Amino acid sequence: MTQIDPPKGGKRLRLGTRGSPLALAQAHQIADGIRAASAGAYDCEIVAFTTTGDKLTTERLINSGGKGLFTRELDDALSRGELDLAVHSLKDVPSVLPPGQIFAAFPKREDPRDGFLSHGAKSIQDLPEGATLGTASLRREAQALALRPDLKVVTFRGNVATRMRKLEEGLADATFLAMAGLTRLGLSEVATPIPLEDMLPAAGQGIIGVVTRDDVDTELLEILGQLSHEPSRVAAIAERAFLEKLDGSCRTPIAAHLFDRGDEWQLIGEVLSPGGTTRWRGDGVCRKDATDAQLVLLGRAVAQEIIFAAKEALPVFGDER
């Protein structure tokens, strides 16, 4: 781990993050928010970690344990008291936090859409027959093959800059990147956003999750709470409940998004077969004033609808959940 940004004044908080440019940008956003919300009473020492997932640059996460590979080192340091806070991209966080840890804030969600990048095409439909798509995401692979089964898929791993470089080197004709990450890095213009209705994102995509221990003092918890954005917090609860019910990991193509429909929330979720040959979708709605418990029930109900429909085809859903 590496100290990136020493505290400038106020009570010191050790804020853990991955060391990629995107992760550091997110950590600085949270650190700045804490300084502002506490009027300088708290300051942050940003501590960067190289996680197991960062070290796996050539293979899919599914082959190395799935979710948690980008959070495990941070989780352990937080549990040992070496960190006060950990900042994560929510889509990388397992559906159940380690014992003794809680979410303290969900800042305003950035663009949740996936972005399409290619030097010769404006959309996946424009790619030539048999074109090569670079991705390490089972979800994106399945969704792309559902639209274009003729595409060839090669594994693309690495941070945003690495994947853009691989595309530039001609290792693939196209790739996908989260618009949230591109926007936070000031690179949104390099990609074409894909409508949510056409390509549902990963649960929690575009949301930052701030995690702390459950014994944190109430003063700090109140300050962190000021960083939260209520619609983003609501979406995080519903989408993660959907994911937890499905026992979601990197082993199954799963997508979910909570849509604002004016006077109600609508959760749409989907599971795809590997390769995208079959897609199962479910949806449900709840009132805007729904409690956290009702949001959890919404997520679980939509997941159960899919489990019932898909259990004959996908053995992972064959047991009762």
UniProtKB/Swiss-Prot annotation:
Disulfide bonds, paired cysteine numbers: none
Keyword match ATP-binding: no
UniProt modified residues of type S-(dipyrrolylmethanemethyl)cysteine: C250
Pfam families: Porphobil_deam, Porphobil_deamC
Keywords for this protein: Porphyrin biosynthesis, Transferase
Protein's pathway: Porphyrin-containing compound metabolism; protoporphyrin-IX biosynthesis; coproporphyrinogen-III from 5-aminolevulinate: step 2/4
Cellular-component GO terms for this entry: cytoplasm
EC number: 2.5.1.61
Cofactor list: dipyrromethane
GO biological process, one term: protoporphyrinogen IX biosynthetic process
Reaction it catalyzes: 4 porphobilinogen + H2O = hydroxymethylbilane + 4 NH4(+)
Molecular function (Gene Ontology), one example: hydroxymethylbilane synthase activity
Gene3D superfamilies according to UniProt: Periplasmic binding protein-like II, Porphobilinogen deaminase, C-terminal domain
Comment on bound cofactor: Binds 1 dipyrromethane group covalently.
InterPro entries assigned: HemC, Porphobilin_deaminase_cofac_BS, Porphobilin_deaminase_N, Porphobilinogen_deaminase_C, Porphobilinogen_deaminase_C_sf
Function description: Tetrapolymerization of the monopyrrole PBG into the hydroxymethylbilane pre-uroporphyrinogen in several discrete steps.
Other known facts: The porphobilinogen subunits are added to the dipyrromethane group.
NCBIfam families from the UniProt entry: hemC
Similarity comment text for this entry: Belongs to the HMBS family.
Quaternary structure (record): Monomer.
Stated name of the protein: Porphobilinogen deaminase
Source organism of the structure: Hyphomonas neptunium (strain ATCC 15444)
Lineage, opening ranks: Bacteria, Pseudomonadati, Pseudomonadota, Alphaproteobacteria, Hyphomonadales
